[in-house]
Design a protein with these regions (language model features):
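Short coil-to-beta-strand
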Residues: 1-7
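Active-site-adjacent betaalpha module
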Residues: 2, 28-35, 54-174
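Short acidic, Gly/Ser-rich segments with clustered Asp/Glu that frequently serve as metal-coordination loops
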Residues: 9-15
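Short, glycine/acidic-enriched capping/hinge loops at junctions between secondary-structure elements
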Residues: 15-17, 53-55
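A short alpha/beta connector and helix-capping loop motif
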Residues: 16-43, 47
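Glycine-rich, proline-tolerant flexible connector loops at the mouths of alpha/beta enzymes
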Residues: 48-52
Length: 174
């Protein structure tokens, strides 16, 4: 198992996210548990390209302080929603013989959704810990509705196993 921390960058990791405090706590808890149990923590950052607010070289591009990578932890950069497309992540995980990926981060309805579905299609067992992904309100639904739609309906039993933080930690321990 690996813990994949997706797009938890300063620009978008804000208190405007749905259920921010629970999200922040869940992600911090899972990162700490992964490290304690020798589960590799891998980060992914999104780059919208030159001139965008979310691009390499801007302050908002860096990982949120509360989730900072340790020296030596892998960081993959992407330019599309899926963490697997053109990043080297797929090849890295296959080379390490990884079968299970626990996914946390942002945003539920964009990069988390794409990463879970693509990971599933690449043959990985995808784990989604409760409250460890979030999103913002949008023109069609509030963040809470997006969160519940994906976590409780779309992914569960189709593309991923949606479990509690405690269950995820139990699995990290083997």
């Amino acid at each position: 198992m690996v813990l994949l921390v997706v797009d938890t960058q300063k620009l978008i990791t804000t208190t405007d996210l749905y259920n921010f405090n629970a999200f922040e706590n869940a992600v911090k808890t899972l990162i700490a548990a992964a490290r304690e149990n020798n589960v590799e923590v891998i980060y992914v950052r999104h780059d919208d390209g030159v001139g965008a607010e979310l691009t390499k070289g801007t302050p908002g591009f860096e990982i949120y302080e509360g989730f900072s990578p340790w020296s030596g932890e892998k960081i993959f950069d992407k330019t599309v929603n899926s963490s697997f497309k053109g990043t080297g992540l797929l090849e890295y995980l296959k080379a390490k013989n990884v079968h299970t990926v626990a996914v946390v981060g942002l945003q539920t309805d964009y990069c988390i959704d794409a990463t879970i579905k693509c990971g599933f299609e690449h043959g990985f067992k995808m784990i989604v810990p409760e409250n460890a992904n979030s999103t913002f309100d949008n023109a069609f639904m509030i963040g809470e509705q997006s969160y519940k739609y994906y976590n409780e309906f779309m992914w569960k039993g189709r593309y991923a196993e949606c479990v509690s933080v405690e269950e995820t930690i139990k699995r990290m321990k083997g």
